[in-house]
UniProtKB/Swiss-Prot annotation:
GO BP annotations, alphabetical order: mannosylglycerate biosynthetic process
The organism of origin for this protein: Methanococcoides burtonii (strain DSM 6242 / NBRC 107633 / OCM 468 / ACE-M)
GO cellular component, as recorded: cytosol
Gene: gpgP
UniProt keyword annotations, A-Z: Hydrolase, Magnesium, Metal-binding
Active-site residues, Swiss-Prot/TrEMBL: D8 (nucleophile)
Protein name, UniProt field: Glucosyl-3-phosphoglycerate/mannosyl-3-phosphoglycerate phosphatase
Protein origin, superkingdom: Archaea
Known EC number: 3.1.3.70, 3.1.3.85
Positions that bind Mg(2+): D8, D10, D214
Known function: Involved in the biosynthesis of glucosylglycerate. Catalyzes the dephosphorylation of glucosyl-3-phosphoglycerate (GPG) and mannosyl-3-phosphoglycerate (MPG) to glucosylglycerate (GG) and mannosylglycerate (MG), respectively.
Length: 272
């Protein structure tokens, strides 16, 4: 039986403020020792994820921009993959809408409403760095978006409802992460997780899926797996928008909770 772990990054595997994953090192080492695939499933861009792939030597498929696409290293699976095309060293399954169209819709909404909406595409790397706390190099990578626009909406609840209405009217969708709203196409983390899980099932037959997240944009992913975990927010609370009967609440904020969840589930089970 093959166990697979899907994980959010910001606020989950990596700390919300420091972007460090040091607190999760014991669990990361355990997964490597047991050869359990760790699949990044996040709002981050492909360019950002490649940094973590190299740093953690985690050469598995990954899911970028809230399920915008699955990037599978060439020759990773022995089975034939369907509905894929090649980009660089990857076989890619796309679910998302082009960034150009998404930006156009967001700009139209801003013009129609006059609301203060600021997306990554409105900022230079220095602006993204200041807003996120990322260093300049990381901020540049965060701007290389393909399927999703992260934005801030500095308005009241009525304005938020209006923006959501206009996003839907344009045939697009939205979600909310730890820091930003996201406008995107007909994709979410859950669709990508289910598609990638099916590929693993074709390869290994029996598969058990695990996922860890912290925010609303993780809910589709958490619904799509066998064992879902929710880690605590920086204030020590769990996101109240995550309503799922089978959810397991990891004790600890971000990577501390992530580490505890994996060590409890994997470290104490000799059969895994």
């Amino acid at each position: 039986m093959k166990h697979i772990i899907f994980t959010d990054l910001d606020g989950t595997l990596i700390d919300h403020d420091t972007y460090s994953y040091d607190a999760a090192r014991p669990a990361l080492d355990l997964l490597k020792e047991k050869e359990i695939p760790l699949i990044f499933c996040t709002s981050k861009t492909r360019a950002e994820l490649e940094v973590y792939v190299d740093e953690l030597e985690c050469h598995h498929p990954f899911i970028s921009e809230n399920g915008g696409a699955i990037f599978i290293p060439k020759d990773h699976f022995s089975i034939e993959l369907k509905d894929v095309h090649e980009i660089g060293n990857y076989k890619v399954i796309e679910f998302g809408t082009s960034y150009t169209r998404i930006r156009g819709v967001l700009e139209d909404i801003r013009k129609k409403t006059g609301f203060k909406i600021t997306g990554f595409g409105d900022l230079d790397a220095e602006g993204v760095s200041k807003d996120t706390g990322l260093d300049i190099r990381s901020a540049k990578l965060a701007k290389l978006r393909e399927y999703d626009e992260a934005f801030r909406l500095e308005e009241d609840e009525n304005a938020t409802a209006k923006v959501i209405e206009l996003i839907h009217a344009a045939g697009l969708n939205y979600t909310k992460g730890g820091r930003y709203w996201h406008i995107m196409g007909d994709n979410d983390k859950g669709k990508a997780v289910r598609a990638l899980t099916e590929i693993y099932r074709q390869q290994f037959t029996e598969v058990v899926t695990i996922a860890l997240g912290d925010s609303l944009n993780d809910l589709p992913m958490l619904k799509a797996v066998d064992i879902p975990f929710l880690v605590q927010k920086p204030d020590g609370k769990y996101d109240p928008s995550i309503i799922l009967t089978e959810i397991k609440h990891a004790e600890g904020i971000g990577p501390v909770g992530w580490n505890n969840a994996i060590m409890d589930l994997i470290g104490k089970n000799n059969n895994i």
